[in-house]
């Protein structure tokens, strides 16, 4: 029997909560530039499922991979690390 690997988890900031049960989470990472050898910030945005509509813009959240929930949603909000002020 085939076993599934670990699901990826990212920590990011909620940048949009205008949709019902969906938030957009911006995840920032550092990438080393090939030519200049300097670390550059890269931002990726993920649509994540928020079942209780508990997230607000500015919240720090942890998201994890899941099965496809819609055309763009493949992530779920696991928990809110820090609420926005």
Swiss-Prot record:
SUPFAM superfamilies: Nucleic acid-binding proteins
One Gene Ontology CC term in the entry: cytosolic small ribosomal subunit
Keyword field contains Nucleus: no
Family the UniProt entry places it in: Belongs to the universal ribosomal protein uS17 family.
Taxonomic path: Bacteria, Pseudomonadati, Thermodesulfobacteriota, Desulfobacteria, Desulfobacterales
UniProt superkingdom: Bacteria
Protein name listed in UniProt: Small ribosomal subunit protein uS17
UniProt KW keywords: Ribonucleoprotein, Ribosomal protein, RNA-binding, rRNA-binding
InterPro entries per UniProt: NA-bd_OB-fold, Ribosomal_uS17, Ribosomal_uS17_bact/chlr, Ribosomal_uS17_CS
PROSITE patterns: RIBOSOMAL_S17
Subunit structure: Part of the 30S ribosomal subunit.
Gene Ontology MF, one: structural constituent of ribosome
Described function: One of the primary rRNA binding proteins, it binds specifically to the 5'-end of 16S ribosomal RNA.
Protein species of origin: Desulfosudis oleivorans (strain DSM 6200 / JCM 39069 / Hxd3) (Desulfococcus oleovorans)
An example Gene Ontology biological process: translation
């Amino acid at each position: 029997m085939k076993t599934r690997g670990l699901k990826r988890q990212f920590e990011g900031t909620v940048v949009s909560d205008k949709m019902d049960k969906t938030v957009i989470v911006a995840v920032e990472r550092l990438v080393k530039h090939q030519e200049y050898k300097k670390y550059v910030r890269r931002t990726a945005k993920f649509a994540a499922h928020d079942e209780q509509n508990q997230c607000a813009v500015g919240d720090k959240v942890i998201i994890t991979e899941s099965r496809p929930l819609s055309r763009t949603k493949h992530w779920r909000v696991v928990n809110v690390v820090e609420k926005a002020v």
